């Protein structure tokens, strides 16, 4: 993809989570799905999201800490990330001794873990948490319904921060410390981040 000659690494396959969708679009999808299904459908609040991600654990992740081997649990920035450095007319991963590699192999990563996915992988490729939920902390991060204000909610937010929406979880390009069940990120509702998708809550009417 760096040479604009091939599609590169596919991130739009049916089994992969949706990305590059704004909060506005994700919320509109939930509303439309609710009308079609007759159920209450919505994005989770960040409190709901964290409760589900932790699955009863008080640690960084349901499976352990930021130093745990996440290879069979979540798709995060691991040793496969080095293969994002590519070269050639039909791009292939650069050799380890390629002098240009240092200019492309710049993403921070955990080199002693291999989760066997370069970018986003098929949903449910890794072990579920104790409550049966997949990919809560990895693969792609997720929009929530919540405004980006101080959390837990103790103070009033100013207009600038309240305009943003909370994103929770990590992704294939983020290290564990940026992917824990407590980490918060924020984007404006019209933004379409390349590593952010969403999941929904479905309740009977």
Set out the residue ranges of the language-model regions.
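Short, structured beta-strand segments at or near domain termini in extracellular proteins/domains
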Residues: 194-205
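C-terminal beta-signal and terminal closure region of outer-membrane beta-barrel proteins
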Residues: 188-189
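Functional-site microenvironments in short loops/helix caps that host divalent-cation chemistry
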Residues: 3-183, 192-194
């Amino acid at each position: 993809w760096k040479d604009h000659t091939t599609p590169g690494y596919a991130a739009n396959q049916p089994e992969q989570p949706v990305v590059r969708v704004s909060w506005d679009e994700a919320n509109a999808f939930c509303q439309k799905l609710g009308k079609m299904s007759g159920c209450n459908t919505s994005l989770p609040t960040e409190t709901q999201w964290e409760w589900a991600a932790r699955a009863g654990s008080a640690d960084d992740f349901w499976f352990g800490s930021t130093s745990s081997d996440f290879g069979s649990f979540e798709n995060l920035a691991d040793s496969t990330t080095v293969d994002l450095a590519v070269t050639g007319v039909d791009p292939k991963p650069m050799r380890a001794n390629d002098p240009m590699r240092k200019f492309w192999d710049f993403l921070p990563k955990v080199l002693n873990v291999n989760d066997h996915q370069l970018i986003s992988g098929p949903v449910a490729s890794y072990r579920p948490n104790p409550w049966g939920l997949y990919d809560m902390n990895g693969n792609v991060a997720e929009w929530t319904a919540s405004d980006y204000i101080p959390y837990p909610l103790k103070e009033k937010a100013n207009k600038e921060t309240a305009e943003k929406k909370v994103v929770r979880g990590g992704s294939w390009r983020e290290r564990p410390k940026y992917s824990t069940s407590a980490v918060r990120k924020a984007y404006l509702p019209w933004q379409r981040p390349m590593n952010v998708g969403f999941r929904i809550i479905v309740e009977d009417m």
